[in-house]
């Protein structure tokens, strides 16, 4: 299996599985995101131990790509600090906008790098809206 097939499988698995699509009863951070150009809406819900993210989930509706991207990022940010999650969101948005991103930065994205070929899709940017509020 080549990398493109692996990336496609990651996206399909998260789009179909939706294991991270649920409310967190004990979330201490809830960040909404809305994309007026396509109508996608999510609420990213996080449980932290003060600084580290110990659980992540989301609710909302949108296309398969936005739902899969949010689900993958939920998996990716667990165990990270809020600042690290914000940095990952910045790298992710630069990646999908085809801006300069180093190999070292791409490694930080984990499975979220699967979206590298989803260029300039506004629904993927919705995730950035929610994650960008974390560093407050």
Residue ranges and their predicted role:
Residues 47, 52-54, 58-121:
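Active-site- and interface-proximal helix/loop "cap" or "latch" segments in soluble metabolic
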Residues 1-35, 98, 116:
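Contiguous domain-boundary segments centered on the initiation and propagation of an alpha-helix
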Residues 21-60:
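Structured beta-strand/loop patches that form or line metal/cofactor-binding pockets in enzymes
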Residues 3, 84, 123-127:
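Catalytic cores of large soluble enzymes that bind and process phosphate-bearing ligands
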Residues 128-129, 133-135:
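Conserved small/polar residues in nucleotide/adenosyl-binding loops
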């Amino acid at each position: 299996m080549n990398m493109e097939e692996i990336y496609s499988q990651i996206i399909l698995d998260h789009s179909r599985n939706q294991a991270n699509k649920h409310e967190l009863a004990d979330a201490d951070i809830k960040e909404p995101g809305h994309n007026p150009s396509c109508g996608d809406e999510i609420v990213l819900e996080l449980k932290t131990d003060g600084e580290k993210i110990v659980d992540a989930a989301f609710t909302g509706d949108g296309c398969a790509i936005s739902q899969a991207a949010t689900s993958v990022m939920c998996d990716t940010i667990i165990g990270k600090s809020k600042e690290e999650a914000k940095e990952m969101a910045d790298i992710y948005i630069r990646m999908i906008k085809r801006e300069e991103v180093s190999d070292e930065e791409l490694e930080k994205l984990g499975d979220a790098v699967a979206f590298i070929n989803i260029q300039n899709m506004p629904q993927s940017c919705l995730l950035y809206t929610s994650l960008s509020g974390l560093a407050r």
